[in-house]
Swiss-Prot record:
It is found in: Plastid, Chloroplast thylakoid membrane. The keyword Ribonucleoprotein does not apply. Pfam families: PsbI. The gene is psbI. One of its GO terms (biological process) is photosynthesis. PANTHER family: PHOTOSYSTEM II REACTION CENTER PROTEIN I (PTHR35772:SF1). HAMAP family: PSII_PsbI. This is Photosystem II reaction center protein I. It comes from Trieres chinensis. GO terms for cellular component: chloroplast thylakoid membrane; photosystem II reaction center. PSII is composed of 1 copy each of membrane proteins PsbA, PsbB, PsbC, PsbD, PsbE, PsbF, PsbH, PsbI, PsbJ, PsbK, PsbL, PsbM, PsbT, PsbX, PsbY, PsbZ, Psb30/Ycf12, at least 3 peripheral proteins of the oxygen-evolving complex and a large number of cofactors. It forms dimeric complexes. InterPro entries: PSII_PsbI (IPR003686), PSII_PsbI_sf (IPR037271). Keywords: Chloroplast, Membrane, Photosynthesis, Photosystem II, Plastid, Reaction center, Thylakoid, Transmembrane, Transmembrane helix. The keyword Plastid applies. One of the components of the core complex of photosystem II (PSII), required for its stability and/or assembly. PSII is a light-driven water:plastoquinone oxidoreductase that uses light energy to abstract electrons from H(2)O, generating O(2) and a proton gradient subsequently used for ATP formation. It consists of a core antenna complex that captures photons, and an electron transfer chain that converts photonic excitation into a charge separation.
Amino acid sequence: MLTLKILVYTTVIFFVSLFIFGFLSSDPSRNPNRKDLE
């Protein structure tokens, strides 16, 4: 059960960090006129 929980937590953290990284890296290129948010 502990191994399953660790696997789930690792997958969740991986996808969350991937989503945050993708959002931060694509946000300025998608909205070049909103650099004041940075």
